[in-house]
């Protein structure tokens, strides 16, 4: 039984939830207050004079004179060392280059030896993609040779279709291949026997080449449902959301009215008016439901 006659329970529940969300947003907007930003602490005036006096103190003349001289002396001392180090590095580099050249000459490789090895690589290793390219064609040919059995599918209006099958194919394979989308509506009959088990193979049914299968396509699919699915449907019917809607709204309104009475200072006039309107609307809905 629907909560409102002519309107589904899902629509009523959806509008109820949307209305509740709007009321909560309105209540939050009416009670929301913006706190003033805190004033930043200004720097203490006593600290600035000390910094200014420290920065304005002159450096002693001895330090100013000694620092450039010390820097020049260190530069003069470091220049011979750096020149000697650069000369040693150049000599080591020339010896290393000569050693590398000698090794390349002893090995019989030129400067482009790496390029010769890369160009010679494909010739020594033949491509491996050729066997894989020929393999699918061989499998297709094998599958075509295996499906050498022909079945005649005869309908009630005396029309026939031929099916290329394999003796190891199942009844379900024939339904999926030749009756796509109508698997649960097709009934296959062989020698007056209804073939209900889709896992049976053609060889187990003793179907020979050029055998006739009578096909019947029903308008309504009669699909067998397991016992667990039927039990789940019964539980779903027992736990109808419509029967829990009224107690849920009563509980929510009770909580809102409790907070409105205990914490009256947090509820503004628009929030209280919205709560009163929701209560009146829900009372009319509940009265209409229980009157029937």
UniProtKB/Swiss-Prot annotation:
Tagged with keyword Lipid metabolism: no
CDD domains in UniProt: Ubl_TMUB1
GO biological process: ERAD pathway
Classification via PROSITE patterns: UBIQUITIN_2
Region (Disordered): 34-143
Places the protein is found: Membrane; Cytoplasm; Nucleus
TM regions (residue ranges): 11-31, 237-257, 269-289
Function according to Swiss-Prot or TrEMBL: May contribute to the regulation of translation during cell-cycle progression. May contribute to the regulation of cell proliferation. The membrane form is involved in sterol-regulated ubiquitination and degradation of HMG-CoA reductase HMGCR. May be involved in centrosome assembly.
Protein name: Transmembrane and ubiquitin-like domain-containing protein 1
Organism: Danio rerio (Zebrafish)
Gene: tmub1
């Amino acid at each position: 039984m629907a909560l409102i006659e002519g309107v589904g329970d899902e629509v009523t529940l959806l509008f109820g939830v949307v209305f509740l969300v709007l009321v909560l947003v309105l209540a939050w907007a009416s009670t929301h207050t913006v706190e003033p930003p805190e004033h930043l602490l200004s720097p203490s005036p006593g600290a600035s004079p000390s910094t200014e006096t420290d920065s304005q103190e002159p450096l002693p003349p001895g330090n100013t004179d000694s620092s450039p001289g010390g820097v020049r002396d260190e530069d003069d001392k470091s220049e011979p060392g750096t020149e000697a180090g650069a000369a040693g590095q150049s000599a080591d580099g020339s010896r290393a280059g000569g050693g590398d050249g000698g090794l390349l000459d002893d090995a019989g490789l030129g400067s482009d030896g790496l390029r010769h090895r890369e160009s010679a690589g494909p010739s020594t290793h033949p491509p491996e993609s050729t066997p894989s390219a020929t393999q699918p064609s061989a499998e297709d040919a094998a599958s075509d040779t295996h499906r050498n059995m022909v079945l005649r599918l005869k309908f009630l209006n005396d029309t026939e279709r031929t099916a290329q099958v394999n003796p190891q194919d199942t009844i379900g394979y024939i339904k999926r291949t030749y009756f796509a989308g109508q698997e649960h509506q097709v009934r296959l009959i062989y020698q007056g026997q209804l073939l209900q088990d889709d896992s049976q193979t053609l060889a187990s049914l003793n179907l020979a080449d050029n055998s006739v299968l009578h096909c019947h396509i029903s308008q309504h699919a009669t699909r067998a449902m397991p016992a667990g699915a039927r039990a789940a449907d019964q539980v779903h019917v027992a736990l109808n959301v419509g029967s829990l809607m009224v107690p849920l709204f009563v509980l929510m309104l009770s909580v809102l009215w409790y907070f409105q009475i205990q914490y009256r200072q947090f509820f503004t006039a628009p929030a209280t008016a919205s709560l009163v309107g929701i209560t009146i609307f829900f009372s009319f809905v509940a009265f209409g439901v229980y009157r029937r």
